[in-house]
Amino acid sequence: MSTLSSEARVVGIDVGTKRVGVAVADPLRLFAQPHGTYAPDEALDVLQALRDADGIARIVVGWPLTEEGTAEEATEMVEAYVERIREALGTVEVAREDERYTSEIAKDLLREAGVSQPGRYDKGRVDAAAAAVILQGFLNRTG
């Protein structure tokens, strides 16, 4: 594993067929924060803008797995999107992070944060929060 530049950001994404949730780590890489939810093409533009503004040290991608921990139908779609990221951004380090239960965890966190029930079920808000859950899991695991 390579050393990460201390200035560049670590970004987390939750890839779906209609939306991509994006989260960004703070400069110290202690906390993940939702950045937004975007259409897949728009998310590539957002990632390019983040790269141009702050640099991106690594993109942490939510990796869809079955209950048993094996690849599932959505895994192929996520793999294809990672290739699109590499085409758009050039050389970028990509890490996979198990995304099982991240949407449920995101909804719980939104509830605990006092977000109203309709807001907790807004798919865009949940996708951005799920990206933050994915990224926070990576940050916690890698220290």
From Swiss-Prot:
The Gene Ontology biological process terms listed for this entry are: rRNA 5'-end processing
Q: Which domain of life is it from?
A: Bacteria
Q: What is its EC number?
A: 3.1.-.-
For this UniProt entry, the molecular function terms from Gene Ontology, in alphabetical order, are: nuclease activity
Q: Which Gene3D superfamilies match?
A: YqgF/RNase H-like domain
CDD domains in the record, alphabetically? YqgF
Which Pfam families does UniProt cross-reference here? RuvX
> Looking at its record, which EC class is this enzyme?
hydrolase
The family classification in the record reads: Belongs to the YqgF nuclease family.
Q: What is the name of this protein?
A: Putative pre-16S rRNA nuclease
